[in-house]
């Protein structure tokens, strides 16, 4: 083929992924082995959020539905970004041509046509939504662009059923170049070199993490912590004793990469309490035998008022231990039960564990909460504690948090400003 086209992108400022602060810039490289009549070279910046909902157990308008007849696939496609730029011929030449579509004869050689795009502040498809269309962004006052999701995962390449259903949603951002040749009815798009024409890239709207952090810093310090109680209470045969676990935290609404999960400074899982209807004798031997912390991912796809959810569990920590609970430090609460602080940070290596330190990618996706028009990705934490009492009774507690905003970016906030050091002014003689 006599014509080749490549799209070359300038790298993102952080070297990993593009953000709202980046300008998507680069050039279209056109290689000609002989002269070609070219009418126009067009470049597009496109962001698409696509979801497919397969027949089966599903929700309609977020309510469970029973299927009486087989259903076909529902497909939903939203163009969250669509920007175009004509890079050839130059604008002054176009203006002089006054609407003429006459092509230009371009001689053999290599040509570079620069371009740049700025991301819009919100999904562009929202203004085109019909009034009755239900989306996950409906009613939002300040909707955000969603991050890339599953753009490297294809349903043709998956090896199991769970991964297949997971692959039925995708958010893809790409730059595409098209070379129009000849007259008005002719166009050229060399499919043999299609990957060079379409350049997919990873996008994360990182300013969202900063906004959540600023909201947290503005929060009233007297706001009570969230309390997450274990799903089931523990009872013992022949006894009126009843036990449960509570996780109390102000900082589980948003979790950032490299946050300490168990240290007191992290304020995530440092306030874990074993609560008892009746106090145990101080001589009792109560121990934590194992600690497990998981991240539960819930990804929901929406199409045609039907939705399917995909659940995954990611292990964050799993530690065997022989931690003895100090029952002498138990306290009576105003509600009448007894509580004992279980200091998980005293268990090695829990005190060293930071959230997503390895920058893990699940099915090729960074750990990041988001809502798009038709894809919702949420996360919860799940804490399992395995207990022994007097070496005889063995039981387990499970605490599940509310949905948490997860970010793949790390943030650092000083707990207090550094001490002010007064410097002596120099003396001049």
From Swiss-Prot:
<dbReference type="InterPro" id="IPR011021">
    <property type="entry name" value="Arrestin-like_N"/>
</dbReference>
<dbReference type="InterPro" id="IPR014756">
    <property type="entry name" value="Ig_E-set"/>
</dbReference>
<keyword id="KW-0963">Cytoplasm</keyword>
<dbReference type="InterPro" id="IPR050357">
    <property type="entry name" value="Arrestin_domain-protein"/>
</dbReference>
<protein>
    <recommendedName>
        <fullName>Arrestin-related trafficking adapter 10</fullName>
    </recommendedName>
</protein>
<comment type="similarity">
    <text>Belongs to the ART10 family.</text>
</comment>
<dbReference type="Pfam" id="PF00339">
    <property type="entry name" value="Arrestin_N"/>
</dbReference>
<dbReference type="GO" id="GO:0005829">
    <property type="term" value="C:cytosol"/>
</dbReference>
<dbReference type="GO" id="GO:0031625">
    <property type="term" value="F:ubiquitin protein ligase binding"/>
</dbReference>
<dbReference type="GO" id="GO:0070086">
    <property type="term" value="P:ubiquitin-dependent endocytosis"/>
</dbReference>
<comment type="function">
    <text>May regulate endocytosis by recruiting RSP5 ubiquitin ligase activity to specific plasma membrane proteins in response to extracellular stimuli.</text>
</comment>
<keyword id="KW-0254">Endocytosis</keyword>
<dbReference type="GO" id="GO:0030674">
    <property type="term" value="F:protein-macromolecule adaptor activity"/>
</dbReference>
<dbReference type="InterPro" id="IPR014752">
    <property type="entry name" value="Arrestin-like_C"/>
</dbReference>
């Amino acid at each position: 083929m006599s014509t080749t086209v490549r799209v070359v992108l300038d790298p993102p400022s952080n070297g990993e992924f593009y953000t709202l602060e980046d300008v998507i810039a680069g050039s279209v490289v056109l290689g000609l082995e002989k002269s070609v009549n070219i009418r126009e070279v067009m470049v597009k910046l496109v962001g698409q959020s696509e979801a497919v909902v397969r027949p089966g157990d599903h929700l309609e308008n977020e309510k469970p539905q029973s299927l009486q007849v087989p259903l076909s696939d529902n497909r939903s496609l939203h163009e969250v970004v669509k920007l175009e730029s004509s890079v050839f011929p130059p604008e002054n030449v176009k203006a002089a041509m006054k609407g003429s579509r006459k092509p230009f004869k371009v001689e053999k050689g290599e040509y570079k046509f620069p371009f740049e795009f700025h991301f819009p502040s919100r999904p562009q498809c929202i203004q085109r939504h019909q009034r009755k269309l239900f989306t996950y962004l409906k009613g939002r006052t300040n909707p955000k662009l969603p991050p890339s999701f599953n753009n490297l995962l294809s349903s043709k390449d998956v090896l199991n059923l769970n991964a297949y259903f997971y692959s039925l949603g995708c958010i893809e951002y790409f730059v595409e170049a098209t070379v129009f040749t000849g007259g008005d009815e002719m166009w050229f798009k060399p499919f043999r070199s299609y990957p060079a024409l379409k350049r997919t890239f990873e996008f994360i709207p990182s300013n969202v993490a900063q906004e959540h952090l600023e909201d947290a810093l503005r929060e009233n310090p007297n706001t009570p912590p969230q309390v997450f109680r274990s799903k089931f209470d523990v009872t013992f045969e022949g006894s009126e004793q009843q036990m449960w676990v509570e996780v109390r935290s102000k900082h589980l609404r948003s979790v950032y990469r490299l946050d300490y999960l168990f240290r007191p400074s992290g304020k995530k899982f440092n306030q874990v309490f074993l609560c008892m209807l009746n106090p145990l004798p101080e001589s009792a031997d109560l121990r934590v035998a194992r600690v497990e912390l998981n991240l539960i991912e819930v990804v929901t796809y929406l199409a045609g008022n039907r939705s399917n959810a995909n659940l995954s569990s990611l292990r964050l920590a799993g530690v065997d231990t022989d931690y003895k609970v100090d029952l002498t430090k138990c306290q009576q609460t105003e509600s009448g039960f007894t509580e004992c602080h279980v200091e998980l940070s005293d268990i090695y290596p829990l005190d060293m564990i930071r959230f997503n330190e390895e920058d893990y990618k699940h099915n090729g996706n960074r750990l990041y909460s988001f809502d798009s028009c038709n894809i919702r990705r949420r996360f919860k934490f799940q804490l399992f504690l395995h207990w022994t009492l007097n070496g005889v009774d063995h039981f387990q507690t499970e605490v599940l948090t509310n949905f948490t905003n997860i970010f793949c970016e790390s943030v650092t906030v000083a707990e207090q400003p550094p001490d002010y050091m007064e410097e002596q002014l120099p003396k001049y003689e």
